[in-house]
Amino acid sequence: MREEIWTEKIFKDDAGYFLRITKPKSRIPLNMRKTVAVLGDASADPDSFKYKLAFETGKMLVDRGYRVQSGGMGGIMEAVCAGAHASKSYREGDTIGILPSFDRTKANEYVDILIPTGLDIIRNGMTGCADAVIAIGGGAGTLMEMAAA
């Protein structure tokens, strides 16, 4: 059986012309959860306001049915993943870490899906894979990631 990949609507407009609107059907399941990338200061201290804000952001996002994506390392990246794990709605796979190196040991303990790219700062463009982006603090690197998104 062939999968239908196009939907069509044919109708008459006010002038009597037949119009055909054709568009591809989405191949993304309707139940697929959206991903939000959270960017920020890699050296944020666990006692800082930014770290606590990132923790609460990760928790809130997972509570509302989103996955979180980060650089997978320390600071804000760790906080958002830890917050996601603290959510009552947390499921395995809710945290995605896109590492700039191939060294898996650099990832924080809260990353479920680890993607070691080996792309260094070029991996910043991977934020474009997310459905939305949130920045919490940071500097030039965070700004570069935001611009790439």
Stretches with model-predicted labels:
Residues I21-K88, E92-G93:
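Glycine-rich beta-alpha loop segments
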